[in-house]
Design a protein with these regions (language model features):
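Non-catalytic, peripheral interaction segments enriched in hydrophobic/basic residues
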Residues: 1-44
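Extracellular or lumenal secretory-pathway regions
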Residues: 47-363, 370-568
Length: 579
C-alpha cells in the first residue's frame, strides 16, 4: 500500500515538472493536447492532495481518539466496571451463583484432629509431670450446609440454620484408622470436677460419689479407649443409677450436657464431636446479604435470636463483629483486617495482614490471627474470668462460653507463656504447623488457603476431696487440637484467574491503545508537515564560470551567452532556411 502511494506521488510530481517546462517554453498550448494535459494534471493534483489530507486527518483523529480511549477505559472505565461487577456478584441474592456456593459449598473442608495420648498416667497420679504423645491427624471431610434460609428484603438479610457433617477419610489419615487404643483423660469426669471447683468447691465430695456410681468406681481419671470412641462413637454414661449423688448429677447432665447421645433407656454416649455430627444446630444465624452495600455482605446481625451475646461483662466483647466466617466483603487491601465472629468460641477474631503471597499462581495477601492477650490489652479484659484472673497471651478461658472449664490456646501452646509449655512434656510448637493463617485474593475476597487452628486444654490440680486427683500436679493439660482448613482446587482457582486474565488483556490493550494512538498522532503531524511542500519544485540557478587554462590546455565551456538555467531556443538548421 505504501509503495503504491509513493509511486502515485512521484508520477504526479513528474508530470508537474513536464507541464512547467512546456509552459515556460510556450510549447504547452502549441499542440492540441496541451490544454487537455493541463486539465488532467490539475485533476490528478487535486485528487492526490485531497486524498492525502483526508487520510492524514483520519490518521490524526483516529490516533487521538485511541489515545484518549486507552487512558479513560484502561485506567478508569474497566476498573470501575470490574469493581461494579464484583460488587454485584458477591451479593447473596436468591438464585445467584455465590448464594448457592455460600449456602451449600460443594467442597468439603479439611478437618484434622490431633489427640494427646498420655504415656505416664500412673506417674501423674503421684504428682509427676504429664508426658504426652501427639497422635494424628485423624482426617475428616467436613461438610457445612446452611438450611431453612429466610430472606428479609427490608433489612437486606438472610437467616439460616447450620448443619455440620464429618466423614472419616482414611486415605489422608496417614495410616490411622480410629481403632488406635489410647490412654486419655475422661473428659466428662474431668469437666465435672473442674466445673464444681469453680462454682461449688464444697460439693466436690458429692461429685466423687456420683463418679463412682455413674462410671462404676473407676480407679483412674485416665481411661483406655479407641480414638474413634473418644472423637465420635462415644464412651458410656450410665444414668440408670438410683443413689442420690448419681441421680442428681445425671439429672444435671441431661439438661446441661449438649453432647450426650442416647444409647438406650437412661444410658448415653459421650464424645467430643458425636453429638454435633449430622445434626442441625439449634441456634440460627442472621447475616446481611450485601445487596444494598457490598461491604456488609456476611456481617452478623443476630445469633440465636439476639443482636449480641450476653455472657461477657462489656458490650464490645458481646458485639457481633465481622462476618460469619464463610464469606467476606471484596475489594480490600493490606490496611484492612479480616474480622469474623466464631460462634463456637463466643467471640470475634481479627486477622492482620503480614505479607504478600502467591497460591497456585494467584497473587494473595497472607493474614494471621491469634487469641489476643487479655492480660495486657484493655479491650480484651472483658474475656477474663475475673478482672484479676486474666490468662497470658493466646490463652482464652472458654468456661462461660461452653459451660465446662475449657482453656483455648494455639496448638502446642504456640506463641504463649513458656511456663505452660514447661508443665508437660511432648509439645513442640512451631509457626508453620500451629499458627492461624489464611491467604486471600483481595479483589474477590476468596480464601485460596486457610488454616483455623485451636487447642483445647483443662487445668489439673491436686483435689484432696476427690481421690482420683488427690495428688495430681498443677498443669494446663492439652487434650486435643483441631485444624479446619481449605485449599481451593484448580476448578475454583481457575474461576478466580478469569478475573485476572481479563485484567491482563485490558492491561495490554490499554498500553497498546495509548502508545499506538500517540504514535498515530505523531505520524499524522509529520505527514501533514511534509505534505505542505509536496507539490513544490525547487530549481537552482547555475551560472557558468569563465574559461580557464590548465597544463596549457583550454577548458571546454558553454558559450557565455548560454544560461543553462533556462531552455534556449534552438538554432534553425540552414537546410530549413533554404526552403
Amino acid at each position: 500500500m505504501v509503495s503504491k502511494r509513493r509511486a502515485y506521488d512521484v508520477t504526479v510530481r513528474t508530470l508537474r515538472r513536464i507541464h512547467d517546462t512546456l509552459r515556460r517554453t510556450k510549447l504547452l498550448y502549441a499542440f492540441p493536447f496541451g490544454s487537455a494535459f493541463d486539465k488532467v494534471l490539475r485533476v490528478l493534483e487535486e485528487f492526490n492532495k485531497s486524498t492525502k489530507m483526508v487520510n492524514i486527518k483520519k490518521l490524526g483523529i483516529g490516533g487521538g481518539c485511541m489515545f484518549v480511549f486507552g487512558i479513560l477505559f484502561g485506567w478508569w472505565g474497566f476498573p470501575a466496571i470490574l469493581r461494579s461487577q464484583i460488587k454485584k456478584a458477591i451479593a447473596l441474592k436468591p438464585g445467584s451463583e455465590i448464594r448457592e456456593m455460600w449456602s451449600n459449598f460443594p467442597l468439603p473442608l479439611d478437618f484434622k484432629v490431633y489427640l494427646f495420648n498420655v504415656t505416664n498416667p500412673d506417674e501423674i497420679k503421684e504428682g509427676k509431670k504429664p508426658k504426652l504423645q501427639e497422635v494424628g491427624p485423624f482426617f475428616y471431610d467436613e461438610y457445612k450446609v446452611k438450611l431453612d434460609l429466610v430472606d428479609r428484603e427490608e433489612e437486606d438479610s438472610v437467616e439460616y440454620s447450620l448443619k455440620s457433617t464429618w466423614f472419616f477419610n482414611p486415605k489422608k489419615s496417614n495410616g490411622l484408622t480410629g481403632e488406635e487404643e489410647m490412654v486419655y483423660p475422661h473428659l466428662m469426669i474431668l469437666g465435672m470436677v473442674g466445673a464444681t471447683l469453680i462454682e461449688k468447691p464444697a460439693a466436690v465430695g458429692i461429685v466423687g460419689k456420683a463418679v463412682d456410681s455413674i462410671f462404676h468406681k473407676p480407679d483412674s481419671i485416665f481411661v483406655r479407649a479407641k480414638a474413634k470412641d473418644i472423637l465420635f462413637d462415644g464412651l458410656p454414661v450410665d444414668c440408670t443409677v438410683t443413689d442420690f449423688a448419681g441421680s442428681a448429677v445425671c439429672n444435671l447432665l441431661k439438661t446441661e450436657a449438649k453432647d450426650l447421645v442416647p444409647d438406650g433407656e437412661n444410658r448415653y454416649k459421650f464424645s467430643i464431636f458425636g453429638g454435633k455430627n449430622g445434626t442441625i444446630a439449634p441456634q440460627r444465624m442472621k447475616v446481611l446479604r450485601g445487596v444494598k452495600n457490598y461491604k456488609d455482605v456476611g456481617r452478623v446481625l443476630e445469633y440465636d435470636g439476639k443482636p449480641a451475646l450476653d455472657i461477657w461483662p462489656e458490650d464490645h466483647c458481646n458485639a457481633f463483629n465481622g462476618t460469619d466466617s464463610t464469606i467476606f466483603p471484596p475489594l480490600f487491601g493490606p490496611d484492612d483486617d479480616i474480622v469474623s465472629f466464631g460462634y463456637e468460641i463466643c467471640r470475634s477474631l481479627s486477622a492482620h495482614y503480614k505479607h504478600h503471597s502467591k497460591i497456585k499462581g494467584v497473587n494473595t495477601l497472607h493474614y494471621t490471627a491469634d487469641l489476643g492477650d487479655m492480660s495486657t490489652n484493655p479491650m480484651e479484659k472483658c474475656f477474663c474470668p475475673t478482672p484479676d484472673t486474666c490468662l497470658p497471651k493466646n490463652l482464652y478461658d472458654m468456661t462461660k462460653c461452653l459451660g465446662v472449664p475449657i482453656i483455648g490456646s494455639l496448638p502446642h501452646f504456640y506463641d504463649s507463656d513458656g511456663k505452660y509449655l514447661q508443665m508437660v512434656d511432648g509439645l513442640h510448637p512451631n509457626q508453620e504447623e500451629h499458627e492461624i493463617d489464611m491467604d486471600f485474593e483481595p479483589m474477590t475476597a476468596t480464601p485460596l488457603l486457610a488454616h483455623k487452628r485451636l487447642q483445647f486444654n483443662m487445668f489439673i490440680q491436686p483435689v484432696p476431696k476427690f481421690k482420683l486427683m488427690k495428688n495430681f500436679p498443677e498443669a494446663l493439660l492439652p487434650l486435643f487440637w483441631v485444624e479446619e482448613g481449605i485449599l481451593l482446587d484448580d476448578e475454583f482457582v481457575n474461576k478466580v484467574k478469569v478475573v485476572f486474565k481479563a485484567m491482563a488483556v485490558v492491561g495490554f490493550l490499554k498500553w497498546l491503545m495509548v502508545l499506538g494512538g500517540l504514535g498515530m498522532s505523531v505520524a499524522a503531524g509529520v505527514l501533514h508537515y511534509k505534505s505542505r511542500d509536496s507539490g513544490k519544485l525547487d530549481i537552482t540557478k547555475v551560472t557558468p564560470k569563465g574559461s580557464s587554462k590548465e597544463d596549457g590546455k583550454a577548458d571546454k565551456s558553454w558559450p557565455p551567452s548560454m544560461n543553462i538555467s533556462t531552455i534556449q531556443a534552438a538554432s534553425v538548421p540552414s537546410s530549413l532556411d533554404r526552403n
